[in-house]
């Protein structure tokens, strides 16, 4: 049976992650409070951020920026802002 969590992002009970994907205390917080669906949404935003802002994951400042964006997105409900990005309309 799948593990469920009360997802802070989706604000509902949902299937949890299979294992802790992020290290440390923040990783435990994500594992305990973020659903698989919300994590997938974050991953797509993360990919867009890395590509559009040309972030280098070997750079400590870039990793810190990405972690801040992740916490804002998952726990504070703040949308990731990517310059020039226009979401596709449902009728397209």
UniProtKB/Swiss-Prot annotation:
InterPro entries: Fe_traffick_prot_YggX, Fe_traffick_prot_YggX_sf
Gene Ontology annotations of biological process type: cellular response to oxidative stress
Pfam families referenced in this protein's UniProt entry, alphabetically: Iron_traffic
Keyword Iron in record: yes
Gene Ontology CC: cytosol
GO molecular function: iron ion binding
Superkingdom, natural source: Bacteria
Membrane-crossing residue ranges in chain numbering: none
Iron as UniProt keyword: yes
Keywords assigned by UniProt, alphabetized: Iron
PANTHER family in alphabetical order: FE(2+)-TRAFFICKING PROTEIN-RELATED (PTHR36965:SF1)
Family according to the record: Belongs to the Fe(2+)-trafficking protein family.
Job of this protein: Could be a mediator in iron transactions between iron acquisition and iron-requiring processes, such as synthesis and/or repair of Fe-S clusters in biosynthetic enzymes.
Name this polypeptide is given: Probable Fe(2+)-trafficking protein
Naturally occurring in which organism (per UniProt): Shewanella sediminis (strain HAW-EB3)
